[in-house]
């Protein structure tokens, strides 16, 4: 329905979130129930920070992984007992290290990412708390002070994935690639309930790739 008019089509291809696309259909035209989705294991969501610094950041490359705390404990907080991790692993990207157009001369653009379980509570207070956690460790591990050099900061988390992308539970990567959610065991590309309706994206075949 566009501008209060129906649009006819020979084929419909949905690139939106698979679960969301099905909720736009009458229940009898959906392939998968809410229980089906609830029982699936999803790959992580993420808390991202987009940060501008008024100086060049030292001792980092374009891509940097900060795995200085227990990997298994963080993984358990994503997959086993979903909760905010006490001490999060995080990834940092500084695109201005390799692309001078990413930041003004003498300044730096940074992106910080914390993997999280999908469906977690997401508040500004939690975002602020976790930025403080990782930026303090970042300063310690890279042997420099940067907090007072922040001139821009925005965050993106579970609620934003839901609001902007209709992402199921705010996931960032689709279903986890477990044995029973791989290849032909994933949601089907072609609807069995609606003629010539097809799906694409991270929740169907082939999925988002190996890491999640």
Language model features: what each stretch is:
Residues 2-103:
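Mid-domain catalytic core of redox enzymes
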Residues 13, 51, 112, 138, ...:
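Hydrophobic, well-ordered secondary-structure elements that form the walls
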Residues 19-25, 54, 104-137:
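Conserved FAD/dinucleotide-binding core of flavoprotein oxidoreductases
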Residues 46, 115-124, 198-204:
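Glycine- and acidic
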Residues 46-48, 186, 202-212:
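Glycine-rich phosphate/pyrophosphate-binding beta-alpha loops
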Residues 56, 85, 124-163:
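Flavin-binding catalytic cores
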Residues 91, 144-205:
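A glycine-rich dinucleotide-binding beta-alpha-beta segment and adjacent secondary-structure elements
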Residues 100-107, 188-192:
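Short glycine/proline-enriched loop/turn "hinge" motifs that connect secondary-structure elements
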């Amino acid at each position: 329905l566009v501008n209060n008019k129906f649009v006819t089509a020979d084929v419909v291809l949905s690139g939106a979130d698979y679960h969301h696309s099905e909720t736009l259909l009458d229940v009898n035209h959906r392939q998968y129930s809410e229980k089906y989705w609830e029982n699936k294991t999803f790959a992580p969501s993420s808390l991202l920070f987009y940060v501008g610094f008024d100086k060049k950041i030292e001792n980092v490359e374009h891509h940097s992984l900060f795995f200085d705390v227990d990997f298994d404990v963080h993984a358990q907080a994503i997959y086993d007992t979903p909760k905010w991790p006490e001490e999060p692993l995080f990834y940092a990207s500084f695109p201005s290290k390799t692309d001078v157009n990413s930041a003004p001369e003498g300044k730096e653009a940074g992106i910080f990412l914390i993997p999280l379980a999908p469906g977690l509570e997401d508040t500004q207070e939690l975002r602020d708390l976790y930025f403080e956690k990782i930026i303090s460790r970042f300063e310690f591990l890279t042997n420099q002070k940067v907090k007072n050099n922040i001139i821009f900061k925005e965050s993106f988390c579970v609620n934003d994935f839901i609001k902007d992308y209709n992402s199921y539970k705010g996931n960032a990567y689709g279903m986890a690639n477990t044995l029973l959610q791989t290849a032909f065991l994933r949601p089907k590309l072609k609807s069995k309930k609606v003629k010539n309706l097809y799906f694409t994206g991270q929740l169907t075949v082939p999925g988002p790739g190996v890491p999640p």
